[in-house]
Amino acid sequence: MALPTHTQLNYRIWHYTYLFFCGLVFFFLIAPLFVILPLSFNAEQYIHFSAKMLALDPEGFSLRWYEDMIYGTKNPWGLATKNSLIIAFFATIGSTILGTVAALGLSSRYMPYKAAFMALLISPMIVPLIISGTAIFFFMAKVGLAATHTGIVLSHIILGTPFVVITVTATLTGFDHSVTRAAASLGSNPVNTFMKITLPLIMPGVISGALFAFVT
């Protein structure tokens, strides 16, 4: 965004310095992707920038690594990708349901101890991941779910629910509860009111939270 012409010099210096450092951080985060992506098309036995790749020779590029990941029988990448997608799918469903229900409860004006419950629900996001992971591992080992798909799904539900709670709660901030009371006065039951009125209105927050939970 351009600065007004009457902006003072010291503010201009600070503004452009700030933009420079923001660009530097952005470059630091994005640059590795521009290095890894070309390497994934390497035709050599080892992943590196070969002489043919640097010379832009078509023989230096190949889809062998993608083919090996998808169709390879001895490569564990295909199985790992499949397991990750399955776990992410079920964890997203669980996190979205729990997070949405929790956010609806927290949005009620009759809900006691809102701050305490909110802090408890988002604590997996605040606590360092190594601490959360260690605690979840020992708990899952105690109940016999360590190294199982069920245990991993439950663990990711715990870590993904806070994202849904935050996004749905933010959406419910501007929610007009008079529409639900109007639906109830016209004879609509709570389930029908939620499915036809509340859910469509908060759907952007639910979808955003689900996406965050999926990538978590």
Where is each model-derived feature located?
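Transmembrane alpha-helices
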Residues: 20-21, 30-33, 165-168, 175-177, ...
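Membrane-interfacial helix termini and adjacent extracytoplasmic/periplasmic loops
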Residues: 4, 50-58, 113-115, 130-159, ...
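N-terminal signal-anchor/first transmembrane alpha helix
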Residues: 1-39
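Hydrophobic alpha-helical elements at and bordering transmembrane segments
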Residues: 17, 37, 77-81, 85, ...
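Membrane-embedded alpha-helices of multi-pass transport/permease systems
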Residues: 30-34, 38-41, 93, 97-101, ...
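Short membrane-interfacial helix/loop motifs at transmembrane-helix boundaries
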Residues: 2-3, 31-74
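Transmembrane-helix boundary motif in ABC transporter permease subunits
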Residues: 2-11, 87-121, 134, 138, ...
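Loop-to-helix entry region at the N-terminal start of transmembrane alpha-helices
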Residues: 79-83, 139-164, 203-205, 210, ...
